[in-house]
Regions:
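Append "with occasional cross-activation on large, charged helical scaffolds in nucleic-acid assemblies
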Residues: 1-200, 206-213, 217-219, 246, ...
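Hydrophobic transmembrane signal anchors and adjacent membrane-proximal interface regions, especially
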Residues: 139, 223-225, 250
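Short nucleic-acid-contacting surface segments enriched for D/E, G, S/T with interspersed K/R
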Residues: 176-182, 216-242
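OB-fold/S1-family single-stranded nucleic acid-binding modules
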Residues: 199, 236-263
């Protein structure tokens, strides 16, 4: 069923491009150089080989990396890092192809849950198939396709933001019920201010650099925090024991400290 749906989406977009009529395309451009450089640093920190045939990796090459880390402690971190590396898919009135699906033509013509772009496309294609000529289609739907694309992209971004906030609230609510408990987690993010640690259950919390050492830390390319005085390091992908010390449900934020027995 999924293959039929993908094919229907592809055929609808191809039909519109060939007919040169206004349309709402689903566009996914390739990742830019800056994001790829960050991904490279992450993969190197996790000990993953990322030598690609060209400057921009193919989706097949990225899938091979994900398969290679499946079942390892780095699986979730690499998966998240790769998602953050990707360009945001959006709706546009001009066909630019879909990097992730490796397709020249793609649109959201059908889906398990009906979306507005689907309905916008149905409206335009129905008009064309009912006998409306190309010139009339251009006059009637050029502005409509542009506005529908822009609004659909904006609403999608907002929906994702709300979804993530809701998840953060529930994770903080869960963490609040387990204050003082110790867990093993994986370092999922490194900043000058401290490190982010993700637990196996998906809860992510922040460990301030000030709680790691009193002598100051040095950040290395966003992948490693080190204490020059003691020689200790905290790198992406490292495991560590933490204690849940704070959980703010309203902000959806959780704070950790290094577990006493591991300081």
């Amino acid at each position: 069923i999924e293959e039929f749906m993908l094919l229907a989406n592809q055929c609808a977009a191809h039909f519109a491009r060939v007919k040169q009529i206004p349309f709402v395309y689903r566009v996914h451009e390739e990742p830019n150089a800056e994001k790829l450089e960050r991904l490279h640093g992450l993969l190197q920190a996790c000990g993953v080989n990322d030598h690609f045939a060209k400057d921009v990796p193919t989706p097949k090459e990225l899938s091979a990396i994900l398969e290679g880390v499946r079942g390892t402690p780095f699986e979730q971190i690499v998966n998240t890092g790769m998602l953050r590396c990707m360009s945001k898919a959006c709706y546009e009135e001009k066909p630019k192809g879909h990097y992730g699906l490796v397709l020249k033509d793609y649109a959201h013509f059908t889906s398990p849950i009906r979306r507005y772009p689907d309905l916008a496309i149905h409206r335009m294609m129905t008009d064309l198939l009912s006998g409306t000529d190309k010139e009339t289609m251009i006059v009637r739907y050029t502005d409509f396709a542009e506005k529908a694309s822009k609004q659909s992209s904006e609403r999608e971004v907002l929906a994702v933001q709300i979804e993530r906030k809701a998840e953060d609230y529930y994770k903080a609510e869960y963490a609040r019920r387990h204050l003082g408990e110790c867990y093993e987690g994986i370092i999922s993010g490194v900043t000058q201010r401290g490190i982010f640690v993700e637990l196996e259950n998906g809860v992510e919390g922040f460990v301030p650099a000030s709680s790691l050492t009193a002598t100051g830390t040095t950040l290395t390319e966003g992948i490693r925090l080190s204490d020059p005085a003691s020689g200790k390091t905290w790198s992406l992908g490292d495991s560590m024991m933490i204690t849940i010390v704070r959980a703010d449900i309203n902000l959806g934020k959780v704070d950790f400290e290094v577990a006493p027995e591991t300081k």
